From Swiss-Prot:
Originating gene: TAS2R16
Function: Receptor that may play a role in the perception of bitterness and is gustducin-linked. May play a role in sensing the chemical composition of the gastrointestinal content. The activity of this receptor may stimulate alpha gustducin, mediate PLC-beta-2 activation and lead to the gating of TRPM5.
Gene Ontology molecular function: bitter taste receptor activity; G protein-coupled receptor activity
Short name of one Pfam family: TAS2R
Gene Ontology biological process terms in this record: detection of chemical stimulus involved in sensory perception of bitter taste
UniProt name for this protein: Taste receptor type 2 member 16
Lineage, top ranks: Eukaryota, Metazoa, Chordata, Craniata, Vertebrata
Keyword presence, RNA-binding: no
Organism: Gorilla gorilla gorilla
């Protein structure tokens, strides 16, 4: 049990972090969206950033409402918010993974014909790949939607005589739904790891070919991408830790530690959101022109 003053402190920190992320996401969407309307085209990285900004904006509001409903035991409201949070959470994971793939194919210096063909195909079909990530999210959220309906049914049956066999089956399916949500995040995480490893291999190759100490534009691009990927890796790892804590949550009072953990995780997400703003040449150029 932690002191109430400390709980309130971390609650305030979490809210401030969340509001900052919401403002940053809104700024990314507004600036790049205006640029899109003016020039009628955007680079693939800016397409990802707009999509990620919209997804993260919705995710952050859903996360705040979800956490407060969980803390104050508003179960009926929580059930309706959970499915929204899970949808945008999975979508954000996929968009982050696509961002690492873009960094990999754009910055890496591999010259193998298969890699060059993949680079050409991915860049050409990037809008369809974004749409595909949305469709994959819609499909993977189906078990969660069913589990959400089951959870509502369990809540309505709470004060009624229950059929123990039916209840056990419903609760078991709800556990499978949680496992399916975890698996849905593993695939983009593996995609992220593969892209990061390829990018690190490309950077190592560049260092071996340019050992004179001079930092050419290609090297700077590698370091910029790796810095963003390093922060993103921390965010991914932190989120998987939250899943682990959820699984072993019976070991301690999760309501007491909820705001401490949320403030810790969203500090990294705030760092990543800031890094995304700095990774877009279009966004930096427009913001510098406004100053």
């Amino acid at each position: 049990m932690i002191p109430i003053q400390l709980t309130v402190f971390f609650m305030i920190i979490y809210v401030l972090e969340s509001l900052t992320i919401i403002v940053q996401s809104s700024l990314i969407v507004a600036v790049l969206g205006r640029e899109w309307l003016q020039v009628r085209r955007l680079m693939p990285v800016d397409m990802i950033l707009i999509s990620l900004g919209i997804s993260r904006f919705c995710l952050q509001w859903a996360s705040m409402l979800n956490b407060f409903c969980s803390y104050f035991n508003l179960n009926y409201v929580l059930c309706n918010l959970t499915i929204t949070w899970e949808f945008f959470n999975i979508l954000t994971f996929w968009l982050n993974s696509l961002l690492t793939v873009f960094y990999c194919i754009k910055v890496s210096s591999f010259t193998h014909h298969i890699f060059l063909w993949l680079r050409w195909r991915i860049l050409r079909l990037f809008p369809w790949i974004l749409l595909g990530s949305l469709m994959i999210t819609c499909v993977t959220i189906i078990p969660s939607a069913i589990g959400n309906y089951i959870q509502i049914q369990l809540l309505t049956m709470e004060h009624l005589p229950r059929n123990s066999t039916v209840t056990d089956k419903l609760e078991k399916f709800h556990q499978y739904e949680f496992q399916a949500h975890t698996v849905a995040l593993v695939i983009p995480f593996i995609l992220f790891l593969a892209s990061t490893i390829l990018l690190m291999a490309s950077l190592t190759k560049q260092i071996q070919h340019h050992s004179t100490g001079h930092c050419n534009p290609s090297m700077k691009a590698h370091f910029t991408a790796l810095r963003s990927l390093a922060v993103l890796f921390i965010v991914f790892t932190s989120y998987f830790l939250t899943i682990l804590i959820t699984i072993i949550g019976t070991l301690f009072d999760r309501r007491c530690w909820l705001w401490v953990w949320e403030a810790f995780v969203y500090a990294f997400i705030l760092m990543h959101s800031t890094s995304l703003m700095l990774s877009s040449p279009t966004l930096k150029r427009i913001l510098k022109g406004k100053c």
